[in-house]
Swiss-Prot record:
PANTHER family linked to this entry: S-ADENOSYLMETHIONINE DECARBOXYLASE PROENZYME (PTHR33866:SF1)
Site residues by UniProt (Cleavage (non-hydrolytic)): K120, S121
Enzyme Commission designation: 4.1.1.50
Signal peptide range: none
SUPFAM superfamilies the record matches: S-adenosylmethionine decarboxylase
GO molecular function: adenosylmethionine decarboxylase activity
Cofactor list: pyruvate
Keyword Membrane: no
Keywords per UniProt: Autocatalytic cleavage, Decarboxylase, Lyase, Polyamine biosynthesis, Pyruvate, S-adenosyl-L-methionine, Schiff base, Spermidine biosynthesis, Zymogen
Name this polypeptide is given: S-adenosylmethionine decarboxylase proenzyme
Pfam families to which the protein is assigned, alphabetical: AdoMet_dc
């Protein structure tokens, strides 16, 4: 959980904006055109707007916020987007803008209590399937942004987000912007202790990944990259059994998947 060793008594509303940008990459080996098409269809169905909405609503609950409005869309030929407007405190229905749907979907209950509207607090998710006809490696990227103002922090949902997707490579950015004031009028540019994003990820999860930080502490910018250590071919072959392949083929495919992950992890073409 977030917090300072010594609590700061703030004057008025906490104006700090905390933004978490979370990108995961799922890698797959698909040799034939049919396998590529089937994988894209599978991913498109597996991570459609309905499921993504459920994930964002779970995140909203985990960080202690409340849904004001949801907009979602599935795209053709593939991809999906969801945007959720949230509030730190639940609003009485009479105070909610009539254009907001209050997240009234089949798996949500309408909450009606207390006050406080944070119109810059939101969650968004977009999906990006990617493949090339000359390449047997397919990737699928999920881009999630969680932006909050007030006391709530998006860092509390990191483990859930990592576990919600097949996360082979992960890039996470966290920044704090704006300032708030204490009761003496002194500006405060961050309201919690943080040395690394990794501090908010479960140790058992971190053991599965190689991780690296690039932080700019004086600017309240934190960046973590993670790459899965174990490449088990059964998790990367789509509709194929690795034991039906020769040892040389398995070695070659594992090597190609590893190179693809290293390039995505480093953000540069190497091989």
């Amino acid at each position: 959980m977030l917090g300072l060793k010594e609590k700061i008594c703030l004057y008025g509303f906490n104006n700090l904006t905390k933004t978490l940008s979370f990108n995961i990459y799922d890698i797959c080996y698909a040799k034939t055109e049919r396998e590529k098409e089937d994988y894209i269809k599978y991913i498109d169905e597996q991570y459609n707007s309905e499921r993504l909405t459920k994930i964002l609503c779970d995140v909203t609950e985990m960080i202690g916020a409340h849904v004001l409005n949801i907009s979602k869309q599935d795209y053709e030929p593939q991809g999906a987007s969801v945007n959720v407007l949230i509030t730190e405190e639940a609003l009485p229905v009479a105070l909610i803008d009539p254009s907001c749907n209050k997240g009234e979907l089949s798996y949500l209950e309408l909450r009606d209590s207390v006050v406080g509207h944070l119109d810059k607090s939101h969650l968004t998710v977009h999906t990006y399937p990617e493949f090339h006809p000359n390449n047997d490696i397919i990737s699928f990227r999920v881009d999630i942004d969680v932006s909050t103002c007030g006391k709530i922090s998006p860092l509390n949902a990191l483990d859930y987000l990592i576990g919600s997707f097949d996360s082979d490579v992960i890039t996470i950015d966290y920044r704090v912007r704006g300032f708030t004031r204490d009761v003496d009028g002194r500006k405060c540019y961050i309201d919690h202790d943080i040395k690394s994003i990794q501090d908010y990820i479960d140790e058992e999860t971190l053991k599965k990944y190689d991780a690296m930080d690039v932080n700019v502490y004086q600017s309240n910018i934190f960046h973590t990259k993670m790459m899965l250590k174990d490449i088990g071919l059964n998790n990367y072959l789509f509709n194929s059994d690795p034991y039906e392949l020769s040892p040389n083929d398995r070695r070659e495919i594992r090597d190609r998947i590893s190179k693809e992950m290293i390039e995505i992890y480093g953000g540069v073409n190497i091989y």
